[in-house]
Amino acid sequence: MDDRGNNSGEVGEFASSSMIQESIDLKLLAAESLIWTEKNVTYFGPLGKFPGKIVITRYRMVFLVGDGGKMYEQWKLDIPLGQVSRIEKVGRKTTSVAKRGDDNYGFTIYCKDYRVYRFTCNPASSDRKNVCDSLNRYAFPLSHNLPMFASVHAAETPRLMKDGWKIYSAEKEYERLGIPNSRLWKEVDINKDYKFSETYPRTFVIPTVSWEEGKPFVKKLGEFRSKERIPVLSWINQTTLASISRCSQPMTGISGKRSAEDERHLTNIMNANANCRELLILDARPAVNAKLNKAKGGGYEENYVNAPLTFLNIHNIHVVRDSLKRLLAALIPRVDEKGYYKALDESKWLNHVQSILEGAVKAVFNVDTEKQSVLIHCSDGWDRTAQLTSLAMIQLDSYYRTIEGFIVLIEKEWCSFGHKFGERIGHGDDNYSDGERSPVFVQFCDCLWQIMRQFPWAFEFTQELLICMLDELYACRYGTFLYNSEKIRLKDKKCDETTISFWSYVLENKKKFRNPMFKHGKSNKVINVNPSLCGLHVWIDYYARSNPYVVTPNHEDVQQPGAQFVDEKKQLLDEIMALDDAAQKLTA
C-alpha cells in the first residue's frame, strides 16, 4: 500500500473514482479518494445477515447490501473512519472452513460512540488483510504519520460564504456581557501568547481590582491553581451583577497550603457584586475524591472567608465512560425486554445526568434568585466545569438558546477554555484503551437534551443539531473539535486557516436544525429546570438509533409498529417549517 492507499488484489481492488461512483452512486467529498473495495462480504445486523460489498475511502467505509447485483441505497451503511475506535479480526485462514463455518472469519468494527458492526468474509477468496490495513491506516492517521482528513478536505474545498471560524469572538461576547463598560471587571491579555496558561484562551476577564494588583499578583494566582487555570468570568447578569466564574482546583496539598493572593482574588470576585454576601463555591467532585486529590497536590477551598463550599458529587471521566458502556449494552444490538430497567438502573447513567443537572440548577438558583455569585470547578476545570457552566448559562441567558448563541457558548466554554477534545475522543489515534477517553461532551449534550424536552419552545434548534454535532465530533471532517486547546488548535495547527469549521455547515443548513416551536418572545426568560430523576429519559434517538427494534428502520421490507406515525410527524414538521419560512418572507 502506498501513501495514497492504493492496493491491488483478486477480490479486493482499488478502483477509479468514476467507476465506483457509477456503480453505486457514491457522492464523494472533496479529497475523499477511494482506497479499496471488497466484494462478497456479509454484514451481521440486528435484522439478520446481509451479503454485499465494502468500499473504503480516505474518509469513510461504506457497506452496500447486494441482491442479485443490485445495490439498495436505503441499506447503505456509512461509517466515517473518525468514528472507529478499533478493528478486530475474527477467525484465521488456517482453521478448517468446515469446522469454522462461513460466519467465523471476518472482522468487527468498534466505534467511539459504542456502536458495533460485524462483517464476515470468505476465507478462501477475500483479502481481509488489505481491508483491515486500509481501515487502520485512515481511521488512525496520526498513528500512521498521515494528516487528519479535516485538513486534506479543506485544502480542496471552496470556503463557504458563512465562515464558522468567525462566529465567535471573545471581545464581541464580552462586549455583549457589558464588560467594556464595567468598572468592576476587565478583559486582560496576559495570556495573549499562551505563556501564562497553555490551556486557557488568549484573553479572559477577571476583577479590575485583581488586575490592578499587577502581573506578579496574577502569576501568583496561576501558581496556586492546577494548570494555571485561575478563577475567571464566564457569565454575568448586567442588572444584578451576579456572576458565574470558573477555574481549576487549588493546589493546597496534604499540608493545607494557602495563598493570600488566591483568597484575595475570590474576595474581589465576591465584591464585584454589590448584592453578594458570600461567594458560593461549587466543587463538582464527590467530597471523597477531592480529599484524595490532596495527596496528589490538589485540594479544595477549606479556609476561605465568606466562601461556602458545596460538593456536587459528579463522578469523573472513568466512571462516566463505564456508565455509558453499560447503558448502551442495554440498548444495542438488542434489548432484553425483561431485564431492560434493571440494566438501565445498574448503568447509573441517568443518575449521573441528574447530578450534573442538579449542580447547574443550584448555580442558576443562586445567581438568578439569590443574586449571589458562584465559582465552579472540578479538578482541572475542563470537563465537569464546562458541563456545569454551559448548562447554567443556557438556563440563565436566552441568547445561548439560539443557534448563533449556542455556537458562541460551545466555542467559549468548551473550545477556548480547553476541553481536551483530542484526548477525550482519541482523534486519529489507535490507542483505544487510553484511559483519558471519555464521553464528557456526549454527557453534556444528553443533559441539554433533557432540558430541551422540558422546554421545547425555548430553543431555536432541535435535537438534530446535537446529534449532528456529536457525529461530527468523531468524524474529523471539520477542525472545530480537533486537539486539546485553543493554543494547539489556532496557534500551533492553525485550524482556522487549514480546516473548515463545523459551524460553517450549521450556518449553511440552519433550516435543517431550526425548531418550528421556538417562541421568540416567550423564550427570553430564565428557564427553571426540574432535575428530578423521574423526569429524565434515555436519549433513544441518539443512543439506540442503530437498533431497528427501538428506532424505526428505513428499510422498505420491515414494518415497525408506529412507523407510519413517525412519517406523519416528520411530514407535519416539514409543513410547519415551510409555513414558518413563508411567514418570515411576508414580514421581511
From Swiss-Prot:
- The residues listed in the UniProt record as binding a 1,2-diacyl-sn-glycero-3-phospho-(1D-myo-inositol-3-phosphate), with positions renumbered to this chain, are 293, 316-317, 379-384, 424
Q: Which InterPro entries match?
A: GRAM (IPR004182), Myotubularin (IPR030564), Myotubularin-like_Pase_dom (IPR010569), PH-like_dom_sf (IPR011993), Prot-tyrosine_phosphatase-like (IPR029021), Tyr_Pase_AS (IPR016130), Tyr_Pase_cat (IPR003595)
Q: Which reaction does it catalyse?
A: a 1,2-diacyl-sn-glycero-3-phospho-(1D-myo-inositol-3,5-bisphosphate) + H2O = a 1,2-diacyl-sn-glycero-3-phospho-(1D-myo-inositol-5-phosphate) + phosphate; a 1,2-diacyl-sn-glycero-3-phospho-(1D-myo-inositol-3-phosphate) + H2O = a 1,2-diacyl-sn-glycero-3-phospho-(1D-myo-inositol) + phosphate; 1,2-dioctanoyl-sn-glycero-3-phospho-(1-D-myo-inositol-3-phosphate) + H2O = 1,2-dioctanoyl-sn-glycero-3-phospho-(1D-myo-inositol) + phosphate
Any idea where the Myotubularin phosphatase domain is?
164-543
Query: Keyword Hydrolase on this protein?
Result: yes
Any one GO molecular function term: phosphatidylinositol-3,5-bisphosphate 3-phosphatase activity
What does the record say about domains? Answer: The GRAM domain is required for localization to the plasma membrane. The myotubularin phosphatase domain is required for localization to the plasma membrane.
Primary gene name? mtm-1
* Catalytic residue positions: 378 (phosphocysteine intermediate)
Query: In which residues is a 1,2-diacyl-sn-glycero-3-phospho-(1D-myo-inositol-3,5-bisphosphate) bound?
Result: 293, 316-317, 379-384, 420, 424
This protein's species is: Caenorhabditis elegans
Q: Which UniProt keywords apply?
A: Cell membrane, Cell projection, Coiled coil, Hydrolase, Lipid metabolism, Membrane, Phagocytosis
Tissue expression as described in the entry? Expressed in embryo, larva and in adults. Expressed in a few head and tail neurons. Expressed in hypodermis, body wall and pharyngeal muscles, sheath cells, vulva, distal tip cells and coelomocytes.
What does the record note as the disruption phenotype of the gene behind this chain? RNAi-mediated knockdown causes an increase in PI3P levels in intracellular vesicles. Also causes an increase in germline cell corpse engulfment, although corpses fail to be cleared. RNAi-mediated knockdown in ced-1, ced-6, ced-2, ced-10 or ced-7 mutant background partially restores cell corpses engulfment.
Write out the function statement from the record. Answer: Lipid phosphatase that specifically dephosphorylates phosphatidylinositol 3-phosphate (PI3P) and phosphatidylinositol 3,5-bisphosphate (PI(3,5)P2). Negatively regulates accumulation of PI3P on intracellular vesicles. Negatively regulates phagocytosis of apoptotic cells probably by limiting the recruitment and/or the activation of ced-5, ced-2 and ced-12 complex. In addition, may positively regulate phagosome maturation by promoting recycling of apoptotic receptor ced-1 back to the plasma membrane. Essential for embryonic and larval development. May promote migration of distal tip cells.
The record's section on CDD domains has: PH-GRAM_MTM-like
**Binding positions for phosphate per the UniProt entry:** 379, 381-384
The identity of this protein, by name, is Phosphatidylinositol-3,5-bisphosphate 3-phosphatase mtm-1
- Gene Ontology terms: biological process: negative regulation of endocytosis; negative regulation of engulfment of apoptotic cell; phagocytosis; phosphatidylinositol dephosphorylation; phospholipid dephosphorylation
